Structure formats: C-alpha cells, structure tokens
Regions:
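A structural-propensity feature for long, helix-poor, extended segments
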Residues: 154-159, 163-167, 399-431
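Short acidic, glycine/serine/threonine-rich loops at helix termini
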Residues: 114-116, 150-157, 255-260, 376
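Low-complexity, highly charged intrinsically disordered N-terminal segments
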Residues: 22-87, 297, 481-486, 504
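N-terminal catalytic cores of NTP/NDP-binding nucleotidyl/phosphoryl-transfer enzymes
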Residues: 97-132, 366
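A glycine-rich helix N-cap at a beta->alpha junction
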Residues: 158-187
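Long, compositionally biased intrinsically disordered regions
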Residues: 4, 11, 232-328, 424, ...
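Glycine-rich phosphate/pyrophosphate-binding loops
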Residues: 114-115, 128-150, 389
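A translation/RNA-centric and nucleic-acid-associated enzymatic feature enriched
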Residues: 288-362, 368-379, 394, 401, ...
Length: 555
C-alpha cells in the first residue's frame, strides 16, 4: 500500500481511459493498460507505482556522479530562483548517498506553459511523498529543458478571456535568433506589455492582484527566459520542496562529460541500435517517435554565441554542423567533450541518460510522447551500460468549473461526447432539449414518406423490376434532401438560441480548446486568477497514482 498523505479537500472526479480519447498513440495506450507486456521496450516497467521502491538499490548502485558538486550547483540555482526552506532541505537530503530522485521536466513555457507542466510537477511530488511514507529518502526534481531551441513553441500560451473565449498571449524579445537555446533568451521590456495583455484578458477577481504581483516578480526584463520560468515554478511549488534543475549550468556539464564522451565514441553503435529499434517498433505496429537517419548524431554542437547546431555524419566519416560551419573527426569531438563539455547538449534520445547519470533517478514522469521515445532511448541506456529508468505517465486532468458542469448536465453530455465536435452535437441538443416538436415532425415525415414509397415499390416491382431500382435511387435523394433540411434546422435553432450557443461555445473553449485536451492548451493563470494559489493544492489532492486514465475534476 502506498501511504500517500490525504488532505481535507475532496473533489468529485471521474476517470476516462485513454483508449476512449482520440489521437492517442497505440504504444502509449498499451503502455497505460499493461506496461509489463511491453518489457522488451521498457525493461524497467512496473505494473504499479508501488513497485518503484524495488528499483532503489539498482539506482543507487549505478549512480556515480559527485553528489556534493551536483548539490552545490543545485543549491546555487535554487537559491537564485527564490527556493523555499523545504526545497533547500531537500537539496541537503540529496547529498546523502541513500537518497533517490523522482524526476520530471518540461520546456520553459511562458508563465509555465500548458497546464500539464503543473501536473508533471505535482505527480513527482506525490510519488516522492509515497516513497518517504515507506521510509525511503526521496526528493522531487524538475528538469527545465533550457537547452531546447524551439523558442516559437514556448513563447506563447493560451488563456480564456473575460467572455470565455480563447486568447493567445505571446512574448517575443527583440534579441532572439534562430537555434538559440531557450535558456539563453533574455527577456526585454516587451515582457511588461505581455503581462499587461495577460491581465487585460483575465477577469478581475479577488486573486488577480496577488497573481499579478507573482508574475511581475518572476518574469522581469533582463532576466533569462529559463530563469523566469524557474522563479515562477519555485514560487508555485516551494511548499512542496520541488528542486529545479537547469542543465545549461557549466558545473552540470562538467559532471555529465563522461556520458558525452562515451556517447560520442559509441555514436555509430547508438545510431545502428536506434534504427534497429525503430524498425522493431514499426514492425509491431507502433509509431517511432524520433526519426533516426544514417547521419544522426546523439549530441548537438553549441557555438561560442550559444547557438545550437545539429551534428551530422558526413559520407567521409567526419561530423559536420548542420550549417556546415564546423567539421570534426570523432576523436576531436571526444576530446572537446572531455575538456569543454559546455560545447555540447544531448539530443532527445540521450537527454534522459544524461539526466539519470547526474541524478539518482528512480522514476521519471513524462507525457505520452516521452513514453513513446523512451521505447527508443532504452537502447542508448543499454549501450552506455545504464539501467533504463522507469517512466510513468504524469497525472492527466480536465478541470471542469461549475458553470460548465451545469452545461454538461443540462444537455446530458459527458467529456467524451465533446470529442465528436460541437457541430456534431447540435442534432442531439436541438432535438432533445430545444425543439423536440419540429424534430418529431421531421421523423414523422420521413416515416410517412418511407411508408408510401414502400407501397409504390411493391407496385412497381410487379410492373417492371428496373423501376424499383430507379425508385431506390430516388428514395435516397429524397431522404438526403430531407436530412439536409433537418441539418439546416439544427443550425438555425442553435443560432436562434443565443444563450445555448454561447454556453456551448464557451464550454468547448474551456474543456476542449482548439480540439485538444484542456491540459495541452490552457495556462494555469486562468485558474490561479479565479481560485488563487489554492488551485495548486486542489490538484495535488486530486492526484491518484493508481489511476492511469485521464481524470476529470469538478470544482
């Protein structure tokens, strides 16, 4: 039994299997249903989070990074981010040789990015508390993906504005150029305008002032993007003792140098194994998350100006940066990695190995895509003689506010009904709740037409069989036109009933924005503005690590 602490807040929740949610990968759905059946791709898979503790001896035996150097770096970066006493206590605990880490991570999104960032952090905290409740030393760590150079992806976030419609908030510093890691992007005065836009869209509540102060204190001009993200995360999760980690730190790069060197020397073996694993996955009917070409290399080159360039194997056996500005032999790359490890950053399939070399990682909480590419990166662990970390899916939520719960109830809907799309729900809503009299007349008309056409069909069949065939064609056309008219009736009724139309549109914007799960689109400021920082605690209390489905929380 997992002795997870329970709180005083009890929220109504429901669980929806991922198999019932559109656009989920086959590999992810099957992993959620039965991870042990996929042991060939996930050798450290467990049936339940309660089995994670059994991995602790193996994790500790394979962790050789200098804990004091690691924790010195972590202490400095967390103090810089305004760490709580509990976080600093956890860093002190991590110095002890029998302490393991429960890790998660995400890109440094604007104002924390999508909601699932919050859910990842709280998932790690919850499992940490489970392990501690069983007498194990464990700490939660959040790996900020500051090495990632896709700034476009993290520079914007979505909220619900005062009328309940979706609005995008974006920040674009003037000095942000292609291939620059997010951690080296510096905020300028444009962040003030972005904050003004955010609070111009959010409704004014009793919590708005507190939230604005929090955002303004953490997202400041002349602050690096990753640092701003770290400050806000530290504030939101300080009470939970979450440790933040920025991999751009030179001290961490030096600690990771042995992994870089070994990955470089074994790069050809890694690429061959990854390509073979991709073929194996595809042969089993799964999708390979990361495409691995023959020229693939597991590390990026970081230039003096900090820009990040992919390295590619050339036909003559050397390695060139994607822009062809630099060319190296394998021995040269290995020597540079040993002496100047800050010139490198790991690719997606190597990143987790670096993470688990630096940290005594007992478990990683990831999303569906991360679970998918772990099936590939497992080969990198094997080649580098590392035990593959157990990966669990982060907790997944849709938060339903009272007004949207009332709309669902009023029209007899569940969250999964929304996946068909708003327009496809119009017939059900119109005919059952708005105008069942006209709907009845349409049904009766179709029935009467079919009765009379059936009589005519019987008569024509005795005269000339081909006439009956002709009638069947015309019947389909008649019923098609009646159906088209009925569809226009549905649209007209919805348009005429403005209250219903607005209720449905705002519900879809809140629960399925841009036809995606809420957690993939909306930013946490929406809920912090309405409910204050209590919202973080409510989500934490709603976490159930035994539930591997998508959970619906009714506030």
């Amino acid at each position: 039994v997992c002795p997870c602490p329970t709180g005083n807040v009890v929220l109504q929740t429901e669980s929806l299997p991922f198999a019932e949610i559109p656009q989920q990968s086959k590999l992810f759905v099957e992993y959620q249903l039965d991870p042990l059946a996929l042991k060939r791709f996930y050798p450290s898979a467990v049936a339940s989070h309660t089995q994670i503790a059994a991995r602790i001896p193996e994790v500790l035996a394979h962790h050789h990074a200098d804990r004091d150097l690691l924790c010195d770096a972590l202490e400095e970066m967390n103090r810089k981010s305004g760490a709580s006493d509990k976080t600093l206590e956890n860093i002190k605990l991590l110095r002890e040789s029998n302490t393991v880490a429960v890790v998660t991570g995400q890109q440094a999104g604007l104002f924390t990015g999508p909601l699932y960032t919050i859910y990842k952090a709280l998932s790690a905290v919850r499992l940490t508390e489970c392990l501690r409740g069983r007498g194990f030393n464990a700490v939660p760590v959040f790996w900020i993906a500051t090495e990632d150079h896709d700034f476009e992806e993290v520079s914007k976030t979505a909220i619900l504005e005062r009328a309940g419609e979706l609005a995008e908030v974006k920040n674009e510093p003037k000095r942000c150029y292609e291939n620059l890691p997010v951690g080296y992007v510096k905020l300028d005065d444009s962040i003030k305008q972005t904050i003004d836009e955010l609070f111009g869209e959010l409704p004014a509540t009793e919590f708005t002032g507190e939230l604005r102060t929090l955002i303004e204190e953490t997202w400041q001009s002349q602050t690096y993007y990753g640092d701003a993200f770290a400050r806000l995360v530290s504030k939101l999760f300080g009470a939970y003792g979450l440790i933040i980690l920025c991999p751009l730190d030179d001290r961490l790069k030096r600690l990771a140098a042995p992994v870089y060197v070994e990955a470089i020397k074994k790069s050809e073996e890694i690429v061959n194994a990854l390509r073979a694993r991709s073929d194996e996955l595809q042969a089993e009917g799964y999708h390979a998350q990361v495409l691995i070409g023959e020229d693939y290399f597991p590390l990026f080159w970081q230039a003096k100006d900090h820009t990040r360039n992919a390295l590619k194997r050339s036909e003559n056996g050397t390695f060139k940066t994607k822009d062809n500005a630099r060319e190296f032999t394998l021995d040269e790359l290995a020597e540079i990695a040993e002496n100047e490890p800050s010139r490198f950053s790991p690719s997606v399939v190597l990143r987790s190995v670096v993470q688990d070399y630096l940290l005594p990682t007992v478990c990683y909480f990831g999303g569906a895509a991360e679970i998918a590419y772990f099936a590939q990166s497992g080969e990198v662990y094997r080649i580098l003689n590392r035990p593959q970390t157990t990966i669990l899916h982060r907790q997944s939520f849709t938060v339903v506010e009272p007004k949207h719960a009332r709309t669902l109830e009023k029209y007899g809907l569940e969250l999964k009904d929304l996946f068909t799309g708003l327009e496809n729900l119009h017939p059900q809503i119109v005919e059952k709740y708005l105008n069942n009299e006209t709907a009845r007349l349409f049904t009766e008309a179709e029935q009467k037409i079919n009765v009379e056409l059936n009589r005519l069909d019987q008569n024509l069949s005795t005269i000339e069989p081909t006439l009956a065939d002709n009638l069947a064609t015309r019947r389909r056309k008649i019923l098609y036109h009646i159906g088209a008219l009925r569809h226009k009736f549905h649209r007209a009724e919805i348009s005429r009933d403005e209250v219903t139309r607005r209720r449905l549109e705002t519900m879809f914007a809140a629960l399925l924005p841009h036809k995606h799960l809420q957690e993939r689109t909306l930013n946490v400021t929406n809920f912090l503005d309405r409910y204050g920082l209590y919202f973080i605690d409510w989500i934490y209390e709603a976490i159930d690590l035994d539930d591997k489905g998508h959970r619906i929380i009714y506030l």
